[in-house]
Amino acid sequence: MPRKANLLKSLARGRVRTSFNKYNLFNLYKKGGVDLKSKSLYQQKWTAKQETRAYHGEHLTEKRWQTVFKPKLDSVAQLDASLRGGEIKETPFLLQTFAVLEKRLDFALFRAMFASSVRQARQFILHGNVRVNGVKIKHPSYTLKPGDMFSVKPDKVLEALGAKKPSFQEALKIDKTQIVLWNKYVKEAKTEPKEVWEKKLENFEKMSDSNPKKLQFQEFLRQYNKNLESQQYNALKGCTQEGILRKLLNVEKEIGKSNNEPLSIDELKQGLPEIQDSQLLESLNNAYQEFFKSGEIRREIISKCQPDELISLATEMMNPNETTKKELSDGAKSALRSGKRIIAESVKLWTKNITDHFKTRMSDISDGSLTFDPKWAKNLKYHDPIKLSELEGDEPKARKLINLPWQKNYVYGRQDPKKPFFTPWKPRPFLSPFAILPHHLEISFKTCHAVYLRDPVARPGQSEVISPFDVPVHERAYMYYLRNGK
């Protein structure tokens, strides 16, 4: 039987445990070096034994630990001459004092970050959620051998490393606050869109490169640039002589009047709002006027044409057949030639215009810059406020009412109410200080499998046994257990 879990998280005692708990992190943070001065040798050994055993196998009774303790400590010897003649760091043999515990299945689960503590790993094993080499094992003390593969049910790993699932009442209160803040943000964005835009970019720029929000923003910028490149490709693909003439014919169809007067340059600008370059607009107007003089732009025909028919008509005007050429007068032929020449020049201008337009809109992922869009705030919508008294105890109704941009049709942290952890999943807070992967395990977090490669050993300058204590403390603890506590 394991020890009872009494005062494991006590801030007064300040013991460091094998746990990802936030109180344990605080104890680790405030923990100074173990004071071994002004103590007798036995007091030093006793203090070291207390501190190290609080971390290494605190759930094991002292009698059980002394049964498995091995005085022989494992290390490796350098067989080649690579270290000869240079400064060789001392091998910390005494950090191997508790290496025998690393072979246990419950410790291996914790070291592989499949459980948030050794006690939780023990619980997973006893409940039949762990397999070794495909066989269900229910013994936490099972000794792993080199080459053994162990696995845990993925849902259990998500529960162990995930954030706490809020209750329905807690989630509703958070959602109410989120809606108030969102409506405040929308109001500010609609009032001062440029200031809010620049403020958002500044916030992303100040974030560290490893911040998930910044990584998500950078991924958005990559997708944004990819979409712009696709739009640019399609725009350049349609930037041909026939394509430009089809656009002019389409403007004639939409804006053309019943009289025989050609469109003015202002009307042409109205029909082609994407053209901002005055030189290009003037060139297109000249081409249009020449084609209008040729008599090939007949409004009574164009007004009845479908989009596909406009493409065919533009192709015929650019490349008239022999029959059509014979029917044209010399003046019409001259006007067509002049129009085609101007259209050819316009293709170059339009291509440059498109390239420059998309180049200015492209974002720079390295510095997180994004061209301001004056219309961005128009798409933001206010969220209807919710009343907690009306939704209390009625989660399905609450799920339908929540419609925030980042949270649609579910209550905060309860996207899947059946799961025992926060959904959509996110890691528990203060996890990164404990994210230390050992050398003797090969881990796959995608499948929640790990391979026990070999027993942990000591090398020059390092030990593969993870411990918050230094060599002098382990030395006294080893001395204590070497004589069975005498």
From Swiss-Prot:
InterPro entries: Ribosomal_uS4, Ribosomal_uS4_CS, S4_RNA-bd, S4_RNA-bd_sf. One of its GO terms (molecular function) is structural constituent of ribosome. It is found in: Mitochondrion. Changing P424L: In MNA6-4; causes temperature-dependent loss of the 15S rRNA. It holds the Pfam family S4. Residues 103-172 form the S4 RNA-binding domain. Keywords: Mitochondrion, Ribonucleoprotein, Ribosomal protein, RNA-binding, rRNA-binding. GO terms for biological process: mitochondrial translation; ribosomal small subunit biogenesis. GO terms for cellular component: mitochondrial inner membrane; mitochondrial small ribosomal subunit; mitochondrion. PROSITE patterns: RIBOSOMAL_S4 (PS00632), S4 (PS50889). Its main location: mitochondrion. Present with 3270 molecules/cell in log phase SD medium. Belongs to the universal ribosomal protein uS4 family. Component of the mitochondrial small ribosomal subunit (mt-SSU). Mature yeast 74S mitochondrial ribosomes consist of a small (37S) and a large (54S) subunit. The 37S small subunit contains a 15S ribosomal RNA (15S mt-rRNA) and 34 different proteins. The 54S large subunit contains a 21S rRNA (21S mt-rRNA) and 46 different proteins. uS3m, uS4m and uS5m form the narrow entry site of the mRNA channel. Component of the mitochondrial ribosome (mitoribosome), a dedicated translation machinery responsible for the synthesis of mitochondrial genome-encoded proteins, including at least some of the essential transmembrane subunits of the mitochondrial respiratory chain. The mitoribosomes are attached to the mitochondrial inner membrane and translation products are cotranslationally integrated into the membrane. This is Small ribosomal subunit protein uS4m. It comes from Saccharomyces cerevisiae (strain ATCC 204508 / S288c). The gene is NAM9.
